[in-house]
Amino acid sequence: SDVCSSDLWKMTRDDEIRYAEEHNIPVEAKIKSPYSTDENLWGRSIECGILEDPWAEPPEEVYKWTKNAQDAPDEPEYIEIHFEKGIPVAMNDEEMDGVTLINTLNARGGKHGVGRIDHLENRLVGIKSREIYESSAAVILHTAHRALEGMIMTKDALRFKDIISAHYADLIYNGLWFSAFHQDLVAYVLSSQRLMKGTIRVKLSKGTCTVVGRKSPLSLYSEKLATYQKEDSFDHGASLGFIKIYGLPVKIQAQKQMDVLAGRGALHLDSIMPPKVKSL
């Protein structure tokens, strides 16, 4: 027998469900609940059915891993995640392997309604598709890891990392894991994470994951430089010279190009302002 794509049969979702029922193929989808779901360690995705209407609120029945935020515990839960070279290795001072940590966070986050995502994603072929996700561990770890990077990385490094992250995500989504480009991006990511050591504390409550504490031996944050109290060690006298130097390009531009910038003989700012919207 040959194996081919089911697309060649031109079957609708209902046709596929009926075929599965007639041939005793176990599937979760039913005619009255025709959702297409996928699950793995990292999360659960749901699509099809009423979800194809972008205006329709997802019915509660589509969710299996996460509680409705309204039904989540009133008491928040605090979790500390420790990272070494950007990799989460412990939770609440207990060392865990990756699989155990992710499973634990999925359970903890799901109990508090954390990890529900409803969005339109752009498929490789250009079609927009509405997807519902339940990914508690992913949301918690991403939130915590981002907070750690914000404490250790410089501003420019953070901005560039965002660019690389977008390319990395697209590459994996588009099935190019085994490409040379992926190897290049991996080299950068691994290098960027060599300093990412520290602990982040998050609060899980009613569908939210909020960073409430952070510490790292490699942090660039200095309380003595940032404080507004008498312990302030920043030399405020240095500000005057910095302001003059930093503002010099804008000052020269205003002197040399004032007529154009003021709108005489060139495009006026009013012409690029958005139109006024009438009341609905």
Give short role names for the model-derived ranges.
Residues R123-L280:
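Basic, glycine-rich polyanion-binding accessory segments appended to enzymes
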Residues D2-S5:
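Short, small-residue-biased leader/transition segments that mark boundaries at the very start
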Residues E28, P34-G86:
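A conserved mid-domain beta-alpha-beta active-site/ligand-binding segment of alpha/beta enzyme cores
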Residues T66, D71-E121:
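A conserved active-site cap/scaffold subdomain adjacent to cofactor or substrate pockets
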Residues P59-A69, T100-T104, K111, K128, ...:
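Glycine-rich, charged/polar anion/phosphate-binding loops
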Residues Y35-E39, H119-I127:
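A glycine-rich phosphate-binding loop feature that marks nucleotide/adenosyl-phosphate handling sites
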Residues R13-I25:
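Metal-dependent de-N-acetylase/amidase catalytic core
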